[in-house]
Curated annotation (Swiss-Prot):
The keyword DNA-binding applies. Gene3D superfamilies: P-loop containing nucleotide triphosphate hydrolases. ATP binds at residues 28-35. GO terms for biological process: DNA recombination; DNA repair. This is DNA repair and recombination protein RadB. PANTHER family: DNA REPAIR AND RECOMBINATION PROTEIN RADB, RECA/RAD51/RADA DNA STRAND-PAIRING FAMILY MEMBER. Belongs to the eukaryotic RecA-like protein family. RadB subfamily. Keywords: ATP-binding, DNA damage, DNA recombination, DNA-binding, Nucleotide-binding. The lineage of its organism: Archaea, Methanobacteriati, Methanobacteriota, Thermococci, Thermococcales. GO terms for molecular function: ATP binding; ATP hydrolysis activity; ATP-dependent DNA damage sensor activity; damaged DNA binding.
Amino acid sequence: MTLTTGVKGLDELLGGGVARGVILQVYGPFATGKTTFAMQVGLLNEGKVAYVDTEGGFSPERLKQMAESRGLDPEKALSKFIIFEPMDLNEQRRIISKLKTVVSDKFSLVVVDSLTAHYRAEGSRDHVELAKQLQVLQWLARKKNVAVIVVNQVYYDSNTNTLRPIAEHTLGYRTKDILRFEKFRVGVRLAVLERHRFRPEGGIVYFKITDKGIEDVLKAKPENGEENI
């Protein structure tokens, strides 16, 4: 069973949507739509959402705007979300552990946005701590049959001249599906499927951020017949 993203292209890219029972990692630079994506999955699907907001990125006003723009009851939408706001890595660990008793069959989604915010602040010695938290999240996904979205940030790797996900190997071991978000041009973002359990890697989908949240970018065919974004 999957949860729709509300974006046809992303659902197809992910093999039907965000899967229950596994962890989806979504990473990319600032302002590429990662938080909006996570909020939208929670908004558009049945069930409660446990949302661990480590960076203060969750906005009730933004969620209400998304709901109203889609003709949904904003207060009802907001009531689905249970928000946790850890201030450091230790509190984050306690909250994630607490989710084992908080998450019931009424929940469909767990979000950690972002998992690595406090990890970055406290240094690279916290690999083991992150691995333990991911182990709990993996248990939640499997035992509670929920989808788990882990948002991750990036750093600049001077050796490869590229942006790489923070704690790449630690997260990569536990996250079965990985989406990378990028800025394509003004008003347009792209999602790249870096890893999936059964879908081919490297697929790309373009999307835009609007009052509704995120939406498909329609391809327009110019006179030469070639498709451009």
